């Protein structure tokens, strides 16, 4: 998709489609008023009759007989004074879905008719670009017949002259984020027989080859064993696919800047191991590597926009399968940190790979560490499919992540990490057990991880409820790439 900023009258531009916002009431934008005059009052009549709707996120088409615009695409914004950021995102998603399904090859967006209630032009442009890229995304890599590509290929965002530089910067930023989200979706949507730990390692090296600011390496099981990663290796013990610890370094800042580390859970298929999952819906366990996929996507976005920050991605990739060599309930393993874990449930495997990866992070002397994982079904029970679960040992870090989520609409909700929950992990035979029972499952999982993060500021993002969608629209969401990218851009010094 080709995007550009436009600071001239959008109505005077020849285009296949002009996007215009409509509010409830008689007072409309200057763009609407001019268009209505050109159409001899027809638009006003259609609005009054309800054929053009001002209801939030509804879209209406009109084909003018005169002028250089072939189509008008109106999007309802509701009551002008009530339009919020969330409402704008909803409207942006709706209008871009309509545009992507149309026959228009190019479009102009009349931004002034959309940015109400002091919504900034740059921010609004970001939402529009990401909404259109998401609407145009398809995954047909594994199909013999490919989907018909979206016809629209060029979009001009028309705004005030003084906003042109902000719009251009927003286009560059949002395009990078959208590209990162697409990579995250692609990796997540791949089946487990293709996307293996070794496949992820190869993708990391391919990404580093594409961007000079990235470098990648992957440790095999021999090196991991030498490092003492007994917990990590216990997960891959039953699989024919060897585990990989993948490290991708992005150096956009100077040598004085500390590293921010992202740790991604990369279980490429989770059968549950000996604690086997039910068969229904097990196909969706290919999405158990979406935390790792989001690390890939975030690093791509940062490299694409040449962000002046240093970030290390650590990906714990393994496949969890049952076999005669698989770890059994009751087995005790020694982690890289030296702490021992009694494994009561082999389906609580994400924390077993993450704990060793978190210990490995110490060598980077990080400013912050954020792990991203489809960790607990309990998070879906607590927060549904809208918010990422957030737990942290540092309030400032937690607040920065929450703010990034609010800004991008990729929101998170903080849960407590109190010492009182730690006792649920007590074991009679090891330093801890890997499950804490049904109560507060998301919290006790984070409590487990917290025992391996004593040497740095750390936050845990449980994306079990937001990483993918089930049903007829099944597919990876690309979250939380917007949140992570926004957070890391906020860490740029100076």
Swiss-Prot record:
<feature type="binding site">
    <location>
        <position position="347"/>
    </location>
    <ligand>
        <name>Mn(2+) 1</name>
    </ligand>
</feature>
<dbReference type="InterPro" id="IPR008283">
    <property type="entry name" value="Peptidase_M17_N"/>
</dbReference>
<feature type="binding site">
    <location>
        <position position="270"/>
    </location>
    <ligand>
        <name>Mn(2+) 2</name>
    </ligand>
</feature>
<dbReference type="InterPro" id="IPR043472">
    <property type="entry name" value="Macro_dom-like"/>
</dbReference>
<dbReference type="GO" id="GO:0070006">
    <property type="term" value="F:metalloaminopeptidase activity"/>
</dbReference>
<feature type="binding site">
    <location>
        <position position="270"/>
    </location>
    <ligand>
        <name>Mn(2+) 1</name>
    </ligand>
</feature>
<dbReference type="Pfam" id="PF02789">
    <property type="entry name" value="Peptidase_M17_N"/>
</dbReference>
<comment type="function">
    <text>Presumably involved in the processing and regular turnover of intracellular proteins. Catalyzes the removal of unsubstituted N-terminal amino acids from various peptides.</text>
</comment>
<keyword id="KW-0645">Protease</keyword>
<dbReference type="InterPro" id="IPR023042">
    <property type="entry name" value="Peptidase_M17_leu_NH2_pept"/>
</dbReference>
<keyword id="KW-0479">Metal-binding</keyword>
<feature type="active site">
    <location>
        <position position="277"/>
    </location>
</feature>
<dbReference type="GO" id="GO:0030145">
    <property type="term" value="F:manganese ion binding"/>
</dbReference>
<protein>
    <recommendedName>
        <fullName>Probable cytosol aminopeptidase</fullName>
        <ecNumber>3.4.11.1</ecNumber>
        <ecNumber>3.4.11.10</ecNumber>
    </recommendedName>
</protein>
<feature type="binding site">
    <location>
        <position position="349"/>
    </location>
    <ligand>
        <name>Mn(2+) 2</name>
    </ligand>
</feature>
<keyword id="KW-0464">Manganese</keyword>
<dbReference type="GO" id="GO:0005737">
    <property type="term" value="C:cytoplasm"/>
</dbReference>
<feature type="active site">
    <location>
        <position position="351"/>
    </location>
</feature>
<dbReference type="InterPro" id="IPR000819">
    <property type="entry name" value="Peptidase_M17_C"/>
</dbReference>
<keyword id="KW-0963">Cytoplasm</keyword>
<comment type="similarity">
    <text>Belongs to the peptidase M17 family.</text>
</comment>
<feature type="binding site">
    <location>
        <position position="265"/>
    </location>
    <ligand>
        <name>Mn(2+) 2</name>
    </ligand>
</feature>
<feature type="binding site">
    <location>
        <position position="288"/>
    </location>
    <ligand>
        <name>Mn(2+) 2</name>
    </ligand>
</feature>
<dbReference type="GO" id="GO:0006508">
    <property type="term" value="P:proteolysis"/>
</dbReference>
<keyword id="KW-0031">Aminopeptidase</keyword>
<feature type="binding site">
    <location>
        <position position="349"/>
    </location>
    <ligand>
        <name>Mn(2+) 1</name>
    </ligand>
</feature>
<keyword id="KW-0378">Hydrolase</keyword>
<dbReference type="InterPro" id="IPR011356">
    <property type="entry name" value="Leucine_aapep/pepB"/>
</dbReference>
<dbReference type="Pfam" id="PF00883">
    <property type="entry name" value="Peptidase_M17"/>
</dbReference>
